[in-house]
Amino acid sequence: DAVRRADAFGPVHRADVGEIDSVMWVSVQCARRMLTHSTDRDILALFVDRVEEGALDGDMLLLVRHGKAEPRKQWTGTDDKRPITPRGASMAYSLDRELACYNPTRLITSPWLRCQQTIQMLSWQTGLPLHTAEPLTEDAFAADPEAAWQCFHKELKNTLQRHSATAVCMHRPVIGGIFGHLRELCATKSLMKRLISSSPYM
């Protein structure tokens, strides 16, 4: 896995040994006492929160919104062929490295061009094929939001069965609809609040 995602992940620079006194395993309570910087204590607190929410037993499904696309008003072709802009391509390049941190082993995308272009580089660099899902297009979602959810839910179940990460690239309206269903699956109200209720701009 590490070899496959090396190009997407980018170079990893070793820490300056002069900044490391020693490496040791300690309890959370002990680590909290040892940390002298407030930012480090904040990171530890976030880690503890995630563990208490069950993150160690969880699997990763990454929701990706396509990069900045050509404005609808300026595009003369059909909406499914509207490409990402140079800014969108830059966003896709940056996103590539972010996604590689999670080591997805399955890539799903709306077949519309802007979604495919956003996640295509990760596919090229890892050798993973792109699987297109017609129900996740904007038009398909507008016509049948339940079919879009069923398509996404199938990928969610596959991810849980395989115990490996999946990345799904789609459109803002579709993500908003998916969030509505995901809120119903949340085990706690605090977890539910993390899924914003308005249409997400990501």
Summary of predicted features, one role per range:
Residues 144-151:
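Short, surface-exposed amphipathic charged segments that create phosphate/polyanion-binding patches used
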